[in-house]
UniProtKB/Swiss-Prot annotation:
Residues 88-99 have a biased composition (Low complexity). This is Rhox homeobox family member 1. It comes from the Eukaryota. Induction: By androgen. A motif (Nuclear localization signal) lies at residues 155-164. It comes from Homo sapiens (Human). Does not interact with itself. Mutagenesis of amino acids 147 to 164 and 155 to 164 lead to a major cytoplasmic localization, with only minor localization in the nucleus. Residues 103-162 bind DNA. The keyword Nuclease does not apply.
Length: 184
């Protein structure tokens, strides 16, 4: 008779580790430890811990809850007082953004006069050249890029409108234009 072993991948034996719990977290304790390689505060590299966000250094899980001593598996976690919400990890998230991320630009709301001017040029040509765009941008008081994007979006709206008209004309058939075939 073959015997099968069931392996629970979620179970972690936490009683093996000695957890030192201090009432206040110490900033820079990990980076000041001798033999530490790397820089920055711990936990800023994302969830690289395969043990479900358990941090054995300060006895806290990734949600800010305390790790219970020993046990695991199906045991209910003991309720421990939660740290105040303004922790260094939260302050680090609100800090300066990475250099490669550009701030999101706000949507430009053109005035009625600006839209009228853009529409009049659009009726003349849907693809204005660079000098025309520059002059138009200077007259309107916006950047050339904003003008270029406006023309690009306007062309897309016109194409969509043309497609809608074509579909509407296909659906609306004139009974006089239809051919009826009667089969006996």
């Amino acid at each position: 008779m073959a015997r099968s072993l069931v392996h629970d991948t979620v179970f972690y034996c936490l009683s093996v580790y000695q957890v030192k719990i201090s009432p206040t977290p110490q900033l820079g304790a990990a980076s000041s430890a001798e033999g530490h390689v790397g820089q920055g505060a711990p936990g800023l590299m994302g969830n690289m811990n395969p043990e479900g966000g358990v941090n054995h250094e300060n006895g806290m899980n990734r949600d800010g809850g305390m790790i219970p001593e020993g046990g695991g598996g199906n045991q209910e976690p003991r309720q421990q007082p939660q740290p105040p919400p303004e922790e260094p990890a939260q302050a680090a998230m609100e800090g300066p953004q990475p250099e490669n991320m550009q701030p999101r630009t706000r949507r430009t709301k053109f005035t009625l006069l600006q839209v009228e001017e853009l529409e009049s040029v659009f009726r003349h040509t849907q693809y204005p050249d660079v000098p025309t765009r520059r002059e138009l941008a200077e007259n309107l008081g916006v950047t050339e890029d904003k003008v270029r994007v406006w023309f690009k979006n306007k062309r897309a709206r016109c194409r969509r409108h043309q497609r809608e008209l074509m579909l509407a004309n296909e659906l609306r058939a004139d009974p006089d234009d239809c051919v009826y075939i009667v089969v006996d």
